[in-house]
Design a protein with these regions (language model features):
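Metal-dependent enolase-superfamily TIM-barrel catalytic cores that perform enediolate-based chemistry
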Residues: 159, 164-276
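Conserved, mostly hydrophobic/aromatic
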Residues: 88, 145, 263, 305, ...
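N-terminal secretory signal peptides
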Residues: 1-2
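Shared catalytic-loop signature of beta/alpha-barrel
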Residues: 259, 270-395
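N-terminal export signals
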Residues: 5-30
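Metal- or metallocofactor-binding catalytic centers and their adjacent structured scaffolds
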Residues: 44-53, 83-147
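C-terminal segment of N-terminal export signals and the immediately downstream linker at the start
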Residues: 21-61
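Glycine-rich, aromatic-flanked loop segments that form ligand/cofactor-binding clefts
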Residues: 133-174
Length: 405
């Protein structure tokens, strides 16, 4: 596909921001040649077949409640698609949305050159194909024999911190004989052994599962206990919108010696409430990051909150927003001094996709970890070193399927 054709399919401002760098918005000759070579390689391949399946991810333990939701279980059965070309290349990834939605548009991909659907320095070229967004990134990496982070511009990936997102209200389980805070500390020790040096604690027990005062005190006690037991770890907290702003300041008053790395979703975001929280933490001398945008994100409101410096970290889900859309969003966040940490809960696959997004584009303050094993996917290429997640240098996302689809 000619360069002018795929540029025409994009919003010009996004295309120019992605394709052009440096003084005078001029691409280097090397970049132009590399782009042309990659496009030619992708044009040799046509989409021949799309297949669907699932992969089972297994958590190392039962994951319990959060402020709003009941037990999260032992791991999801993730819907995936595999995209095969007429030259025998195959890429795969989680579906964005349902299989039914994907099947309704798959005919728009069949028979097309990969270069008609995907450009390495852009991502997918038609938003209608977002169901296959991540799989097309993997496929392009396989064809070009490059890891996805290299498609995004880095020979060696940026690396960033990696936190355990596995610490829920497991002190409340089993319901007939709750294990108490010792269970939380046991889980933190396990996660520390995995390699995490950041631990995210779910809080908000008084929203639904305990009387408010009792739940608030348990949140405070858990936070203080974990911070004391793991002094070399960053502590993050996530309220899942289970507080009011006044209730949340009560929580902060109960943990004066804990230096929180970030505060996530203490309440459903509004300008007034985040202004009140920002004013409080500033007056109290609390240095922490405010992170939001996961649950039912309102893009216009989030934009306002970031522009007003009321939020620091954007959390919208890596699959929900889409990999290509995250590529578009990242420079916009940088313009307002904000950082990213795409929501990845549920599937370790999403953590690993995020490692490539962060590896190629940086500006990612930490990555959500969802500790898992799988008999269906080879996850061994990814490593945790010094508390950071290191993606592999193999093609695509570097996760070979161990099952046929």
């Amino acid at each position: 596909m000619k360069r002018r054709t795929f540029l025409h399919t994009l919003n010009w401002s996004i295309a120019s921001a992605t394709l052009y760098h440096g003084a005078g918005n001029a691409m280097s000759l090397t970049a132009i040649l590399d782009s042309n070579i990659r496009e030619k390689e992708l044009s040799y391949h046509r989409i021949q077949e799309i297949k669907y399946s699932t992969v089972q991810m297994k958590y190392p333990r039962l994951v319990g409640k959060n402020a709003r939701l009941d037990l999260h279980g032992y791991g999801p059965n993730v819907e995936i698609c595999g995209i095969k070309t007429d030259k025998g290349a195959m890429g795969w990834a989680s579906l964005r949305g349902s299989r039914k939605d994907a099947e309704q548009i798959e005919k728009e991909l069949l028979g097309k050159k990969v270069s008609e659907l995907f450009a390495p320095n852009i991502g997918i070229l038609n938003d209608r194909h977002i169901a296959f967004d991540i799989a097309l990134h993997d496929l392009a990496g396989v064809i070009l024999e490059k890891p996805v982070y290299e498609l995004l511009g880095r020979d060696k990936p940026y690396t960033t911190d990696y936190y355990s997102g596995m610490i829920y209200f497991d002190d409340l389980e089993p319901s007939e004989k709750p294990a108490g805070i010792d269970r939380i500390l046991e889980e933190c020790r396990y996660d520390y052994g995995v390699g995490y040096r950041q631990l995210k604690l779910k809080i908000g027990r008084g929203h639904k599962w305990m009387p408010f005062k009792e739940g608030l005190q348990r949140d405070i006690d858990v936070t203080n206990a974990v911070a004391q037991a793991f002094p070399d770890c960053g502590i993050l907290v996530d309220g899942n919108n289970g507080f009011t702003v006044d209730q949340f300041t009560q929580y902060l008053k109960g943990i004066p010696s804990v230096n929180l790395f970030w505060i996530e979703e203490p309440f459903h975001e509004t300008v007034a409430d985040y202004q009140k929280l920002r004013n409080y933490i500033k007056a109290a001398g609390i240095r922490t990051l405010l992170a939001d945008g996961e649950a039912d994100p309102n893009p216009a409101l989030l934009k306002e909150l970031f522009e007003k410096k009321l939020l620091d970290v954007h959390l919208t889900d890596i699959e929900g927003l889409g990999f290509t859309n995250w590529r578009r969003l990242m420079p916009e966040l940088e313009k307002v001094g904000a950082q990213a940490s795409p929501h990845a809960w549920g599937s370790l696959l999403k953590s690993y996709y995020t490692a490539h997004l962060a590896g190629g584009l940086a500006n990612t303050v930490t990555i959500e970890g969802v500790t898992s094993t799988s008999d269906d996917v080879d996850l061994s290429g990814y490593k945790i070193q010094d508390g950071k997640l290191i993606p592999p240098s193999t093609a695509g996302f570097g996760m070979p399927l161990l099952k046929k689809i």
